[in-house]
Structure formats: C-alpha cells, structure tokens
UniProtKB/Swiss-Prot annotation:
GO terms for cellular component: cytoplasm. Belongs to the tRNA(Ile)-lysidine synthase family. Its EC number is 6.3.4.19. It catalyses: cytidine(34) in tRNA(Ile2) + L-lysine + ATP = lysidine(34) in tRNA(Ile2) + AMP + diphosphate + H(+). Pfam families: ATP_bind_3. The N-terminal region contains the highly conserved SGGXDS motif, predicted to be a P-loop motif involved in ATP binding. It is found in: Cytoplasm. This is tRNA(Ile)-lysidine synthase. It comes from Rickettsia bellii (strain RML369-C). It comes from the Bacteria. Keywords: ATP-binding, Cytoplasm, Ligase, Nucleotide-binding, tRNA processing. ATP binds at S27, G28, G29, S30, D31, S32. PANTHER family: TRNA(ILE)-LYSIDINE SYNTHASE-RELATED. GO terms for molecular function: ATP binding; tRNA(Ile)-lysidine synthase activity.
Length: 430
C-alpha cells in the first residue's frame, strides 16, 4: 500500500533524528496534497508537529484559491499553516529558476525562525525520471546526472520521501479518498522543456521508464561508492581556501584524480568563491581542464571568477565584471555580503554600509593600506583580490577594510569572516 511505502521511506530518511517538528511544502497540486495527507498520518503516529508552508508566486489566477484550499485543509487536519509570497517584481526572465530559488529561500528562512530542521517536498518518481532526461539532454557529467532524496538549502534539510512513488499512485490515492487537488495549467505548456519531455514519456512503454530508473540507480551507486569519497579526499588533499575569499588548487595532486572528480572539484571551487548557488555547466568547465592539461600558465574567467594558473598552482578569486555586488546597510549586528562574507558590527554605529572598494576610494586611502600579508598569501595577486573584499563606508567615507586591518580610527568596530552560503549534497555530512 502507498502509506506503508511512504512510511518506510521517511523512516529511513529521518527516522533516527528524534525530531519534534517538521515542515512540509504544499502547492495544491496532486503530489503535494497527497504528501500532506500521508505526512499527517505519519506525524500524528510519531507525535511530531507538522507545519504546512505554501508559497504564492502571484503568477496564476487560481493561486489565491489554492492557498485558501491548503489553509482550510491544514485547519481541518489541525495543522499550523503559513502562507508566503514570492515577489517576481514583473521580471519574467529565467522565471522558473528564480521562482524555485525564491520559494526555497522563503520556506527555509521561515524554518529557521521556527527552529525547524527538516522540510518535506513532494518530488516523486516521475520528477526524477524527467530530471535525468533533462540532464542527459544537456550533456551533464555523472555528478550532474545523479539524484538524491536528501538535499540542503539554507542549512535546512530537504527530504523527498516520495522519490520512488509514481505520480499515478498519488493521484489514485487522492481519487480513492475523494480528496480535492488543483491542476496547474502551465504544466501543459510546451514552452518549458520539462513539459515536452513529460509529454513524450507519457507516450512511451512502461519499460522505457523502468530502464531510466535503472540507469539512475546505477549512477547514484557509482557516485556514492566511488566518486563522492574521491571528491571529499580530493578537496582535503589539494584545496586551500583563504579567509580572504580566494582558493588555491594543487595541480600536481589534481592530475591524479579521475576526470569526473576534476570537473566537480573545479565546480565546487567556482561556487564557493563566486558566491553563486548553481554550478557551471560541464561544457563551460571542460575548456579550463584542457588549459590545465597543456601545462602552460593562463588567466581566464568563468562563473564570476578569475582562474589563473601559476606553474603548479591554480588560483581562483572573485570577479565582479559588470554585475557589482549590492551595497547593504548594516542595520543589525550581522549581515552577509555578496553571498560570501559575514560582516559583524562590534559597536552601535549608524549609517554603516557594506560595499566594495572602488578605484576612487582606493586612490584616497592607498598610502595607508598594509597589503603585505595578503600579498604573501595570494602569491602577489593582492591588488586584484583587494577589490573583491568587503569594505564599510559611512557617508561615502571608507571607515574599515577588516581583512587588512584598515580602520580610520583606533577602534576595531567590524569583523569579517568568509562564510559562503553553499551546501553540497556531495560533501555535506549528516
């Protein structure tokens, strides 16, 4: 039966955590509504408080009806309900990806406020099949083709207990129990590649899906048993990440790793140093690997980073390009700047802005800067890296560059730590 399969999955995924409360993402579609009812049975059985979270993207006319239905259903089940709103700001560029990130940002931020460690989502077997086909079409490497029923976002564990359950079983469960759900009409639109793949798969014989599932399982086993342990060892042996927000890669050790791990290792460093959430495509990393194999020094840019070879070392540091980091007002004690640096204010100082060092600011204060430590650590690349570090300004005046201990008075009013907002399912321990 469906519930027994669900119970087996969720107990294996989080049964030993001893949690007292869990959140669940519900959209109103058949997948998440089925998950809501299944999770409610399990939560009551295990004396766990369930919190229902729903995000209104304000993109469809029926979204308000869906939110109202989910709220009423949660109330009927005796569950706490939270409605969140994603503001797309009338910017429809790359909307699916932005909405996905915004949705997870909103839900995991609320989980942190509610002291909830786990968020359940309704990704089912058909979703995994579609993802595999999409990634295969995009020529993803073996790491990109792999999947997991456990992920992380914003230090919240994302659990997918329906990973081996087909959508048809979820729909049948709802229909049998006379439970209402909503159909998202955008799922029929062929302007989204995923929908086209879904429609093609629906016409295929069952054995085609079974073959894809078998391939997915083999890839996952290969990652778990071979490449994931190698990647963790590779990071420990060959990578040095500096508090100044740059990294060195030992190319002699790097040459001894498998091709799959070399690609993932470069991607790992690009994400950490750039502060971006998503990895670079395999086809964009491959030219860098070719340059490395040529054993010649080079300097290139990729994924918001400068990649520079110096003999047997590869230096990677931030590159802003035309997209400069947002300046942020230090209203609270702490903030994260450029998704990489955590700035702490030690004293109650007003009108503080965290931003980047401009050339004009540098010209004013350059005679007062001591860059010797940064110069030694970065093998002479201190000038370039200096302009990637956070500074603090008050009324347009640079008052602090904490990394190089520059302050315009004797009070050390600010501290900075390198804390990129990134968690990888390949390197995260839980």
């Amino acid at each position: 039966m469906l519930y027994e399969k669900f119970e087996h999955n969720i107990n294996n995924l989080i049964g030993g955590f001893g949690l007292s409360k869990i959140a669940i993402a519900v959209s109103g579609g058949s997948d998440s509504v089925a998950l809501l009812y299944l999770a409610n049975i399990w939560a009551k059985k295990n004396n766990i408080e369930l919190f229902v979270l729903s995000v209104d993207h304000n993109l469809r006319d029926q979204s308000k009806q869906e939110i109202e239905y989910i709220q009423n259903t949660a109330n009927d089940l005796g569950l706490k309900f939270y409605s969140l709103f994603f503001d797309h700001q009338n910017n429809f560029s790359n909307l699916q990806e932005r909405a996905r990130k915004g949705r997870y940002d909103l839900m995991t931020s609320l989980c942190q406020k509610l002291d909830i460690l786990v968020l359940l989502t309704a990704h089912h077997e058909d979703d995994y099949i579609e993802n595999f086909c999409l990634r295969l079409e995009r020529k993803s490497g073996v790491f990109g083709l792999s999947s997991s029923s456990v992920n992380w976002h914003n230090n919240t564990q994302i659990i997918r207990p329906l990973f081996n359950i087909p959508k048809s079983e979820l729909v049948n469960y709802l229909a049998t129990n006379n439970i209402k759900w909503f159909e998202d009409q955008s799922n029929l639109s062929t302007k989204y590649r995923r929908n086209t793949i879904r429609q093609k798969l629906a016409k295929e014989e069952v054995y085609i899906k079974d073959d894809i599932i078998t391939q997915q399982i083999k890839v996952n086993e290969l990652i778990e048993n071979k490449f994931k342990p190698e990647l963790i060892s590779a990071i420990a042996e060959s990578v040095k990440i500096s508090e100044y927000g740059f990294a060195f890669l030992d190319l002699i050790k790097f040459s001894g790793f498998s091709q799959e791990v070399r690609v993932q290792l470069i991607n790992f460093l690009l994400i950490i140093i750039s502060g971006q959430q998503r990895s670079a495509r395999f086809y964009s990393v491959e030219p860098i690997l070719k340059l490395i194999r040529q054993s010649l020094d080079f300097k290139n840019t990729l994924h918001g980073c400068v990649i520079k070879r110096m003999q047997n070392k590869l230096l990677i540091y931030r590159e802003f390009g035309k997209k400069l980091p947002e300046s942020k007002l230090l209203l609270d004690k702490q903030l994260v700047w450029d998704n990489r640096f955590r700035i702490t204010k030690n004293h109650n100082i007003e009108n503080c802005v965290a931003t980047y060092l401009s050339l004009e600011d540098y010209k004013i204060i350059k005679e007062k800067l001591d860059l010797e430590v940064l110069k030694n650590l970065s093998c002479g690349n201190h000038n370039a890296i200096l302009f990637t570090l956070p500074i603090v300004k008050i009324l347009e005046k640079v008052v602090a560059i904490p990394h190089i201990s520059y302050y315009d008075n004797d009070i050390k009013s600010f501290n900075v730590s390198f804390a990129p907002d990134f968690t990888s399912r390949f390197t995260h321990f839980y």
